[in-house]
Amino acid sequence: MIVLVQANVLTVGLGDKNEALQELPLRLIAMSSGSEAARSLKNERVDSVISKWDLDDMKNGLFLKRFRAVKPEIPTIVFVKAGDRAQEIAARSSGASAVLTEDTTDEFFQTTVANILGLRGIVSIKTISPAESEKSQYEKIAK
C-alpha cells in the first residue's frame, strides 16, 4: 500500500499521544525534549509543530515561544494540563493554532490536526491484513 504524506509534523513531549496520528497521512518526527526538537529543526522542514506546553527541559512554553518567534507562520498545537487555566491562557496568548488539554480524546485530536493542516476528504487510513480483504479501509474524519 502506498500512502502519500501530506505534511511533516514535529511532535514534542507527546509520548503515547503520537499513536493517535498514525492513521493520518503525516510524516511524524517525534522528539521527547525541547532541546532535541530545536536541534532537529535545523535539518528538518516541518509543516506543523505539536507540543506539550510544559516540557521537562523547557517549562512555561519556552520551546513554543522560541519556535513561534522564528516561524510564526507555521501552525502549532499545544497540549496543556486539564484544568490549568493559567497554562491555557498563556498557550492561547502565544498564538497557537489550537490548545488542547492532555485528556483530549484521540478522535478529537485527529480531527483538530486534520482541520488545522487542511487535510480534507479521506485522511484516516486503516489497513487490514490481505487475508481479510484485498483493499484498505478508509475513514473520513475531516469535512
Where do the protein language model's features map onto the residues?
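C-terminal output helix
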Residues: 86, 104-113
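Two-component/phosphorelay signaling modules centered on CheY-like receiver
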Residues: 11-32, 36
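Two-component signal transduction core modules
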Residues: 49, 76, 99-100
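CheY-like receiver
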Residues: 120-143
